[in-house]
Amino acid sequence: MEAVVLERSIVVKADRERVWRAITTPEHITKWFEPIRFERLAVGEALTFSWNGEGSIALVEPMDRFGFRWQIAPPHPAQTLVVFVLETVPEGTRITMTEQGFEALPDEVRQARFKDNTQGWEHMLGELIAYLTSREP
């Protein structure tokens, strides 16, 4: 089966360091995404989401790329991989978010989760822009 990838890109008027903190620090993530817990920013570190979902940190390249895996359709064990890539642009920072791995889900679940996550990321990236353009991070 062909890979199913969700991709969105936004540009925000914030420097990379500020964006990096917002996407990799639990106290900041909670402000724009949802409550999430982890102890260390390290590959393999377990993540716990507010809805009792679980995952793990999959990629840490400071100031450049951050990724995590999460189970998006419990009880189905498949996990998708979410990756944020940061790039400095004249307007601030471009954030490109991809989520892949949907093809591991059964057809009916895959279609529903892809649609839900597409809408969800549109909303969450809007929340991230709002958070980054506030005074907080």
Language model features with spans:
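Hydrophobic ligand-binding cavity/cleft-lining segments
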Residues: 1-38
